[in-house]
Swiss-Prot record:
PANTHER family xrefs: NICOTINAMIDE-NUCLEOTIDE AMIDOHYDROLASE PNCC (PTHR13939), NMN AMIDOHYDROLASE-LIKE PROTEIN YFAY (PTHR13939:SF0)
Gene3D superfamilies named in the record: 3.30.70.2860, CinA-like, MoaB/Mog-like domain
Entry protein name: CinA-like protein
Organism: Acaryochloris marina (strain MBIC 11017)
Family stated for the protein in its record: Belongs to the CinA family.
Classification via NCBIfam families: cinA_nterm, PncC_domain, PRK00549.1
InterPro entries, A to Z: CinA, CinA-like_C, CinA_C, CinA_KH, Competence-induced_CinA, MoaB/Mog-like_dom_sf, MoaB/Mog_dom
């Protein structure tokens, strides 16, 4: 008989939308990666009657139940005792759990409260899943021969670590994992998802590996997946398809897996021993924030200027006052002067600038909201690029897209210099 897993996330805060249920997303990805069938997810509030109904339904259709949330010390943390009550199992006290909690509290110069005592009560026969970070341990439990139950705290940082350190090895050693799904995600910029899908259409019909397009935050992606017994075997299947895609899509493909535009640009600058400075107006430091979010960016990023006013552009970046008056701050010539100015002032190899209208106010018929100019100044001169970003998704979207366009322009220039 085929076996499947089911996810049950406990917490009224999830139902009310007060907390994003990232644990469900994480488990969906992990179960898919491990090749474990997974057909149902449930979110249930902190109510023992409704939790029992969720358990009863899950037991009818799944053999692996994974609970997140409801393991804390407060009265509305009910997962453990509700499970014990449903399966008519007594709760057993584990002094070693209280000792672990006391030790963790002592490291913070605190002492546990009496409410923490309930976290040491686990169903009879359950195996403790240690929590290396927080106070709430989880369990592995077999209340019935054909049923396995995991419980985890709802705090994502705690849950993710416990999952990787205890649950995954257990599933691998007990026959739940026979062949994993390995995936390679390719990331693209400057090409819509629909256009990308058209270009690689023959590859989308493949069955091993499979190729699937999707988009996130304006960025098109392709996931290449195969089921294999090892990373090496998977690579042999995936690599030729990745090579085909890169040949088809050219510079639109900027990286893979966890790579970002800023990390790719940083790597290129490091390889060349070159430096970067930025001048920002409408993005208000967003470009610099993305660049400095990459570990090691201090080796190539010298700094930036947020020149939000015309006076700042003139005084800090040496933008020509007459050009500001004639063409306005949102113009190609000002973007170029900003990029050249910050490059000169900070003595960097490259200077990037962004000036535009992020909205929702400030637009006009000739310069609508979403109009953005990117300036790029380097050893071979200075140029600018005009973008009209849709204002329908708001100010933050325009600012985010602007920083991505700026990074992509520098990436393309760096690659062009190498060819």
């Amino acid at each position: 008989m085929s076996r499947s897993a089911e996810v049950i996330c406990v917490g009224t805060e999830l139902l009310l939308g007060e907390v994003l249920n990232s644990n469900a997303q994480f488990l969906g990805q992990e179960l898919a990666r491990l090749g474990i069938a997974h057909f149902h997810q449930t979110v249930v509030g902190d109510n023992p009657t409704r939790i029992k109904r969720a358990i009863a339904l899950a037991c009818q259709r799944s053999q692996l139940l994974i609970f997140t949330g409801g393991l804390g010390p407060t009265p509305d943390d009910l997962t453990t005792e509700t499970l014990a009550d449903f399966f008519q199992a007594p709760l057993v006290n584990h002094p070693e759990i209280l000792e672990d909690i006391a030790r963790k509290f002592a490291q913070r110069n605190r002492v546990p409260s009496p409410s923490n005592d309930k976290q040491a009560l686990l169903p009879d026969g359950a195996q403790i899943l240690p929590n290396p970070i927080g106070s709430a341990p989880g369990i592995i439990w077999h209340p019935r021969p054909e049923l396995t139950i995991f419980t985890f705290p709802g705090v994502p940082k705690e849950f993710h670590r416990m999952w990787q350190e205890t649950a995954v090895p257990y599933l691998q050693s007990t026959g739940w994992v026979t062949a994993q799904i390995y995936s390679r995600v390719l990331r693209f910029w400057g090409i819509p998802e629909s256009t990308l899908a058209d270009q690689v259409a023959p590859l989308l019909a493949l069955t091993n590996p499979t190729v699937a397009p999707y988009a996130s935050k304006g960025q098109a992606r392709l996931r290449i997946s195969t089921r294999a017994t090892s990373q090496e075997t998977a690579h042999q299947v995936i690599a030729p398809i990745e090579q085909q895609i890169r040949q088809i899509c050219g510079l639109h493909c900027f990286g893979g897996d966890d790579e970002t535009l800023e990390s790719v640009v940083g790597k290129l600058l490091q390889q060349r021993g070159e430096t970067l400075a930025v001048a920002e107006s409408c993005t208000g430091g967003g470009l610099g924030q993305r660049i400095t979010g990459v570990s090691g960016s201090s080796t190539y990023f010298l700094g930036g200027v947020i020149s939000y006013t015309n006076a700042a552009k003139r005084d800090l970046l040496k933008v020509n006052a007459a050009d500001l008056e004639q063409y306005g701050a949102v113009s190609a010539i000002v973007a170029e002067q900003m990029a050249a100015g910050v490059r000169s002032q900070l003595h960097s190899t490259w200077g990037i600038s962004i000036t535009g209208i992020a909205g929702p106010d400030g637009g006009s018929e000739t310069k609508p909201v979403g109009l953005v100019y990117i300036g790029l100044s380097g050893p071979q001169g200075t140029q600018s690029f005009e973008y009209q970003i849709s204002p329908l998704r708001g100010r933050d979207w325009i600012r985010q897209m602007s920083t991505s366009h700026a990074l992509d322009r520098l990436r393309r220039q760096l690659l062009a210099d190498e060819s």
